[in-house]
């Protein structure tokens, strides 16, 4: 008998019910009780969705972020929040976003830092530690969910983040060693496991994904210490790893005193033989055999071919699951009513992935003949995709093969370009700009919806969008910004917008996944070779530039970010797909330049998140990623200024690669880290211009003029003032005009003060 289970289920709801409830609560439209009821309804639905599994995860639901949930379970709440009055949920949202529902300005606090969850597009709230951090157990949330789940009749498996990964994910605020806290933390984990065991829980999934990263001796010792301390727990521990291979941590993972080990068999299939040999015979081995991070059907027959000898050896010690939490997958393919039927047949979302796990387990336990129809249907779909002429475009392949090194080079060095751009643009010191998008009002979203549904003709839609663009331009002129943007009213998403206009893409209606908090994204699906049939942005940017004498930025998403924020075909190397995207963006850049656009921004917000988790593999990734950007950006004259933007990035370890992109201006997200990201520039003299973000757009809080000046002065300690720009952290799409106007006015006023300081000096 094979045990089937799941590491986690998407929490947002098939139609984003959680998102809408969160935002209604924050705006005071619904009560806390109503928000909690939505959460309870979603949990019940999701447990029913997983009822075919032998073990159902509990504790994977969150009102914002699972790492923040763990922080509250362990009593790790920043003092700036814990001193405020209010209930636990209010303080929870204050850490997450700087304020809770209907907080007045006096209750606003600095939101917790947010960064990427390993190499995914999910973001977590970074735990904050000091040498004096104390831990205290608060299991109420988890216990309440266990009580709910028991009522469904499911056999439950609580899910928690392991103690060593939790410390690894956090940040020391006083330069103390995070691992010094481990001995203080472990008794709280032991108490939590005892509480869970007393609830009748047999298995607890304890996630230690750092085991797929490069660990030094100190962190390996910490893992040994942690699990030898926790081994007396009455509950059995399933140690879960995901997102990669164990490699040099394989022996350690096998030897830790736990009841079982889950591994990512999508990325780590080559290690399974060694795992079978090394894992003690009293432990279970859970294999993640269905890809939890992509949307392609599993080739079930091929998977069974290699799984059969594994099952023959392990028998009931073999467990099957997706490779990682299905948090990274859309919920239900059956919701897709408008997708091309052939392409839809190639896909599997979260619910379908659980079906695949069950089919595999049944085929192994009871024989393939018991699921012959399901296996035949799966084989037909896999074969259809493999042989479809829609996937392959010979002209695109020829264009990629014709790429030369010269296509990635600018005509002159940065100093020459900078002089020519300064002469052409005539910008002041500390030039102000924004990152691209402006608030997406209800009117904008309604117009796009009506256009998609055929209620608006092309000319009617164009008129409405031009009105929004003009409004955005006038707002920026009134605020006094130096370099303007058109506001992106016509764009639903910075990746999906481009994908809709590229051949080789298909789109879902409800393929939403959580990015952070209430922010959901609907990644487009790359199913075939990529090409650009026609210009994608030129009409809108030309119109915006016609409204003003100030420079108007052309706004594009870069090839690496489009790749990393899409569901990508898995039948060819990612690098090859990225080069196809680079050629499409290059053609758009050249069209914008021909249209008279003087500044072109090519966002590479997701450059860093594509890095492999192991540093040994970075060089190969950065080589083709930087090369792709340069191919996209560098077919222009010296006088054309190329910008790029990056989000949530630590730069110390890839600063040379970023410099190698050779963008004239780079804007980065730094406000939540209080400019700490600029530490990268202490030992590396970045040669070009840079705009460190001074306005945290992920929080509704409005930065003061004084605060912005202080941040920019910190930046000027590292970057020469004549190479600094003043800008928000990221696009303003998710904010409203009532927040944006005063924030940008303070930013413009701060820039004026900085210029006056330079003149006075």
Swiss-Prot record:
Keyword vocabulary terms for this entry: Amino-acid biosynthesis, Metal-binding, Methionine biosynthesis, Methyltransferase, Repeat, Transferase, Zinc
InterPro entries, per database record: Cbl-indep_Met_Synth_N, Cobalamin-indep_Met_synthase, Met_Synth_C/arc, UROD/MetE-like_sf
Residues the entry annotates as binding L-methionine: 435-437, 488, 603
Pathways per UniProt: Amino-acid biosynthesis; L-methionine biosynthesis via de novo pathway; L-methionine from L-homocysteine (MetE route): step 1/1
Protein's UniProt name: 5-methyltetrahydropteroyltriglutamate--homocysteine methyltransferase
Function as written in the Swiss-Prot or TrEMBL entry: Catalyzes the transfer of a methyl group from 5-methyltetrahydrofolate to homocysteine resulting in methionine formation.
Residues that, per the record, bind L-homocysteine: 435-437, 488, 603
Binding-site positions, Zn(2+): 645, 647, 669, 730
The EC number(s) this enzyme carries: 2.1.1.14
């Amino acid at each position: 008998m094979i045990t089937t289970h799941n590491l986690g289920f998407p929490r947002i709801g098939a139609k984003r019910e959680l998102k809408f409830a969160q935002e209604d609560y924050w705006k005071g439209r619904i009560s806390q009780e109503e928000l909690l009821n939505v959460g309870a309804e979603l949990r019940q639905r999701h447990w029913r969705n997983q009822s075919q599994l032998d073990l159902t995860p509990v504790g994977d639901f969150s009102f914002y972020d699972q790492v923040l949930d763990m922080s509250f379970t362990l009593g790790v709440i920043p003092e700036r929040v814990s001193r405020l009055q209010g209930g636990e949920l209010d303080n929870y949202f204050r850490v997450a976003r700087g304020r809770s529902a209907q907080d007045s300005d006096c209750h606003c606090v600095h939101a917790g830092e947010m960064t990427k969850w390993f190499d995914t597009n999910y973001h977590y709230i970074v735990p904050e530690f000091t040498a004096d951090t104390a831990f205290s157990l608060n299991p109420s949330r988890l216990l309440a969910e266990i009580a709910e789940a028991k009522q469904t009749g499911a056999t439950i498996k609580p899910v928690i983040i392991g103690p060593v990964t939790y410390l690894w994910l956090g940040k020391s605020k006083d330069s103390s060693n995070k691992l010094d806290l481990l001995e203080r933390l472990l008794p709280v984990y032991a108490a939590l496991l005892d509480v869970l065991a007393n609830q009748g829980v047999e298995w607890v999934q304890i996630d230690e994904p750092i085991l797929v990263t490069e660990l030094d001796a100190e962190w390996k010792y910490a893992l040994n210490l942690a699990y030898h301390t926790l081994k007396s727990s009455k509950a059995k521990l399933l140690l879960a790893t995901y997102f990669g291979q164990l490699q040099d941590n394989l022996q350690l993972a096998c030897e830790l005193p736990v009841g079982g080990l889950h591994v990512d068999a999508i990325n780590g299939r080559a290690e399974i033989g060694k795992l079978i040999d090394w894992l003690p015979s009293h432990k279970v081995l859970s294999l993640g055999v269905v890809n939890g991070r992509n949307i392609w059907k599993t080739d079930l027959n091929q998977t069974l071919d290699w799984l059969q000898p594994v099952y023959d050896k392990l028998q009931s010690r073999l467990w099957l699951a997706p490779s990682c939490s299905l948090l990274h997958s859309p919920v239900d393919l059956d919701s897709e009513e408008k997708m091309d039927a052939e392409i839809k047949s190639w896909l599997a979302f979260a619910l379908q992935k659980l079906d695949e796990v069950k089919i595999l387990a049944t085929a192994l336990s009871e024989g393939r003949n018991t699921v012959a129809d399901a296996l035949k249907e799966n084989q037909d779909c896999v074969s259809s995709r493999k042989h479809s002429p829609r996937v392959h475009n010979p002209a695109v392949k020829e264009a990629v093969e014709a790429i030369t090194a010269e296509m990635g080079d600018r005509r002159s060095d940065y100093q020459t370009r900078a002089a020519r751009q300064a002469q052409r643009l005539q910008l002041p010191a500390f030039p102000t700009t924004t990152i691209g998008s402006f608030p997406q009002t209800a009117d904008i979203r309604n117009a796009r919806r009506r256009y998609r549904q055929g209620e608006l003709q092309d000319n009617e839609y164009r008129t409405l969008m031009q009105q929004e663009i003009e409004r955005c331009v006038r707002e920026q002129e009134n605020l006094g910004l130096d370099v303007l943007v058109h506001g992106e009213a016509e764009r639903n998403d910075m990746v999906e917008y481009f994908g809709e206009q590229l051949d080789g893409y298909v789109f879902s209606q409800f393929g939403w996944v959580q990015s952070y908090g209430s922010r959901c994204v609907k990644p487009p699906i790359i199913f075939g070779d990529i090409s650009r049939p026609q210009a994608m942005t030129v009409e809108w940017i030309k119109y915006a530039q016609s409204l003003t004498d100030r420079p108007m930025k052309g706004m594009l998403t870069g090839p690496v970010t489009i790749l990393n924020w899409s569901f990508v075909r898995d039948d060819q190397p990612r690098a090859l797909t990225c080069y196809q995207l680079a050629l499409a963006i290059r053609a758009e850049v050249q069209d914008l330049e021909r249209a008279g656009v003087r500044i072109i921004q090519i966002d590479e917000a997701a450059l860093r998140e594509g890095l492999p988790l192991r540093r040994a593999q970075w060089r190969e990734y950065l080589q083709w990623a930087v090369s792709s950007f340069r191919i996209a950006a560098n077919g222009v004259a010296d006088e054309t200024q190329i910008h790029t933007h990056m989000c949530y990035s630590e730069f110390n370890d890839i600063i040379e690669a970023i410099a190698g992109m050779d963008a004239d201006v780079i804007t980065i997200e730094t406000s939540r880290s209080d400019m700490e990201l600029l530490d990268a520039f202490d030992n590396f003299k970045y040669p070009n211009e840079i705009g460190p973000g001074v306005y945290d757009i992920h929080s509704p809080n409005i930065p003061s003029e004084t605060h912005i000046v202080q941040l920019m002065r910190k930046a000027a300690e590292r970057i020469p003032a004549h190479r600094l720009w003043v800008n928000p952290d990221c696009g303003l799409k998710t904010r409203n005009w009532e927040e944006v106007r005063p924030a940008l006015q303070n930013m413009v006023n701060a820039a004026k003060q900085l210029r006056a300081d330079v003149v006075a000096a």
